[in-house]
UniProtKB/Swiss-Prot annotation:
Its EC number is 2.7.7.24. Pathway: Nucleotide-sugar biosynthesis; dTDP-6-deoxy-L-altrose biosynthesis; Bacterial outer membrane biogenesis; LPS O-antigen biosynthesis. NCBIfam families: rmlA. This is Glucose-1-phosphate thymidylyltransferase. Homotetramer. Keywords: Lipopolysaccharide biosynthesis, Magnesium, Metal-binding, Nucleotidyltransferase, Transferase. Binds 1 Mg(2+) ion per subunit. One of its GO terms (molecular function) is glucose-1-phosphate thymidylyltransferase activity. Its cofactor is Mg(2+). One of its GO terms (biological process) is O antigen biosynthetic process. Catalyzes the formation of dTDP-glucose, from dTTP and glucose 1-phosphate, as well as its pyrophosphorolysis. It comes from Yersinia enterocolitica.
Length: 289
């Protein structure tokens, strides 16, 4: 299975901070924002990942992440010249996807919850159809909203409705089968001129091939698109890490646990960062394992 991180956009809600740097390169406590969505794909067992961003920002992502080998993954990069909709990611990434199943995660979404890795691996093992993730919110009119029947089977998906039919929002994480590229090509631009991910999900729903995984009580799904939400996310990660002593979205740790990195390689990476708490954490991890 392949994975895509969509890290484009102008980040206008975060101006003036994002006038000189991509939103997804901003820090969320002790890591660049893009570490968090990459960690989700890695937890799902995905090693081949495409980073899509603007032509202006791609060089910065390449400087930060390189070819991904230090995280036990294989990274490629592609340009999105203009933000023409989330579903455009599959058309841009057609050559990368190469007829395989593919997951898409938005570059400004953070997920944290117990047993999330197990849930992701189960979803990634499905060969047919699409899977989206639902999360209960108090302001559903801001999101794509899922309507369910009494057995929690999806009936409809509506983008930012004035009168939501439920309080379950579609989060920025999607898994699709090998048909996704051809289906994305069938989408016609919406009134705002974009290839909408909601339309793609509706197409799978019409075929009876859309599943919804619910992220329940106690799970955290954080958006980082505003100044306040960026601070809230940083404080959340800070609290978890300081209280429990482990790191959230530590890519080297996930790679090591997945046996994508050897202990020797982990030590080497840690030594390069030994003047930081992050590097000390990696050294401790290698010694204790």
């Amino acid at each position: 299975m392949k994975g895509i991180v969509l890290a484009g956009g102008a980040g206008t809600r975060l101006h003036p901070i994002t006038r000189g740097v991509s939103k997804q390169l901003l820090p969320v406590y002790d890591k660049p924002m893009i570490y968090y969505p990459i960690s989700v794909l890695m937890l799902a067992g995905i090693q081949d990942i495409l980073i899509i961003s603007t032509p202006e920002d791609l060089p910065s992502f390449k400087r930060l992440l390189g070819d991904g080998s230090q995280f036990g993954i294989r990274l490629q990069y592609a340009k999105q010249p203009s933000p023409d909709g989330l579903a455009q990611a599959f058309i841009i990434g057609e050559e990368f996807i190469a007829g395989e199943r593919c997951a898409l995660v938005l570059g400004d979404n953070i997920y944290f919850g117990q047993s999330f890795g197990k849930q992701l691996r189960e979803v990634a093992s499905r060969n047919d159809g699409a899977t989206v993730f639902g999360y209960q919110v108090v302001d559903a009119e801001r999101f794509g909203v899922i309507e369910f029947d009494e057995n929690f089977n999806a009936l409809s998906i509506e983008e930012k409705p004035q009168k939501p039919k439920s309080d379950w929002a579609v989060t920025g994480l999607y898994f699709y089968d090998k048909d996704v590229v051809e289906m994305a090509k069938e989408i016609k631009p919406s009134e705002r001129g974009e290839l909408e991910i909601t339309t793609l999900n509706e197409m799978y729903l019409a075929k009876g091939k859309l599943r919804v995984e619910l992220l329940g009580r106690g799970f955290a799904w954080l958006d980082t698109g505003t100044h306040d939400s960026l601070i809230d996310a940083s404080l959340f990660i800070h609290t978890i890490e300081k209280r429990q002593g482990f790191k959230v979205a530590c890519l080297e740790e996930i790679a090591y646990q997945n046996q994508w990195l050897s202990r020797e390689k982990l030590n080497e990476l840690a030594e390069a960062l030994n003047k930081t708490y992050y590097g000390q954490y990696l050294l401790k991890l290698a010694k204790e394992s």
